[in-house]
Swiss-Prot record:
HAMAP family: Pept_M48_protease_HtpX. Binds 1 zinc ion per subunit. It comes from the Bacteria. The active site is at residue 140. It comes from Histophilus somni (strain 2336) (Haemophilus somnus). The gene is htpX. Its EC number is 3.4.24.-. The chain crosses the membrane at residues 4-24, 33-53, 146-166, 186-206. GO terms for cellular component: plasma membrane. One of its GO terms (molecular function) is metalloendopeptidase activity. Keywords: Cell inner membrane, Cell membrane, Hydrolase, Membrane, Metal-binding, Metalloprotease, Protease, Transmembrane, Transmembrane helix, Zinc. It is found in: Cell inner membrane. This is Protease HtpX. One of its GO terms (biological process) is proteolysis. Zn(2+) binds at residues 139, 143, 214.
């Protein structure tokens, strides 16, 4: 329900901005409607395709090995743990995979709750205790339960639409003279510059939302396995070497992430200290 309300609110915001721009610029409504349709199609197409292909693309990008029949005790434990957590969260069993990497990380992805993936690095399995790894798995299961992959796709689509539409509307105003003639060269250059600038701002918004969802996934893990296990997992991450930021959409749903300075505005994860503090402040889970 919250995801639907968010989507409706963002679409209302698009229409509100659309009408303001028409009023300020004097651009004909039919021209603006055509551009808005183009921006929406272009803005959402890439995000939706990425979502639909996210599971297979993720497995390919990390060379992940899906666990169908456990070959050892670790794989058996992984399947049993994810199955138990998914059952408690009211979810179908996700696909579980392991990928070889020294980086201590895990991620969740997939277009729907019925077609989701939880992948874990060998580095995480080697570096963490079972309790800590259990908390990380619960964090990823919480991402799936909350539908974060779909929510991020909708948000990215709306942001893409805003960037394309506003950039081209403003470029049209600047590139059009008093006689109504538009210089295509000036229009193209200005629209490209504005799309770059607004694209950076849109990335900051998307990453802010991703960091917000990380706090929620941490809380979801605490609800599933107890907050002390999740705190222990995050503290373990603090003691390890600086992790590598995952690429693309995987970064938003991994357990780990980099930090630092102004660059933190573009990171998918909050600082570990803030995540630990937020967990300690979960009064309703003090007994766990």
């Amino acid at each position: 329900m919250m995801r639907i309300l968010l989507f409706l609110a963002t679409n209302f915001a698009v229409l509100f901005v659309f009408n303001i721009i028409l009023t300020l610029t004097g651009i004909q409504r039919q021209d603006a409607v055509g551009l808005l349709i183009f921006a929406t199609l272009f803005g959402f197409t890439g995000s939706i395709i990425s979502l639909l292909m996210s599971k297979s693309m993720a497995l390919r990008s990390v060379n992940g090995q899906v666990i169908e029949q456990p070959r050892n005790e670790t794989e058996h434990w992984l399947l049993q743990t994810v199955h138990s957590q998914a059952e408690r969260a009211g979810l179908p069993m996700p696909t579980v995979a392991i990928y070889h990497s020294a980086d201590v990380n895990a991620f969740a992805t997939g277009a729907t709750k019925k077609n989701s993936l939880v992948a874990v690095s060998t580095g995480l399995l080697n570096a963490m205790t079972r309790d800590e790894a259990e908390a990380v798995l619960a964090h990823e299961v919480s991402h799936i339960k909350s539908g974060d992959m779909v929510t991020m796709t909708l948000l990215q689509g709306v942001l893409n639409t805003f960037v394309i539409f506003i950039s081209r509307m403003l470029a049209k105003v600047v590139a059009t003279d008093r006689d109504g003639n538009t210089s295509q060269g000036i229009y193209f250059m200005i629209s490209m510059v504005l799309e770059l600038v607004f694209g950076v701002l849109a990335s900051m918004i998307a990453m802010w939302f991703s960091r917000y969802r990380e706090f929620k996934a941490d809380a979801g893990s605490a609800e599933l396995v107890g907050k002390h296990k999740m705190i222990a997992a995050l503290q373990r991450l603090k003691t390890l070497h600086e992790p590598q930021e995952m690429e693309g959409q995987l970064a938003a749903f991994a357990i780990n992430g980099k930090r630092g300075g102004l660059a933190s505005l573009f990171l998918s994860h909050p600082p570990l200290e803030k995540r630990i503090e937020a967990l300690r402040n979960l009064d309703s889970l003090n007994g766990k």
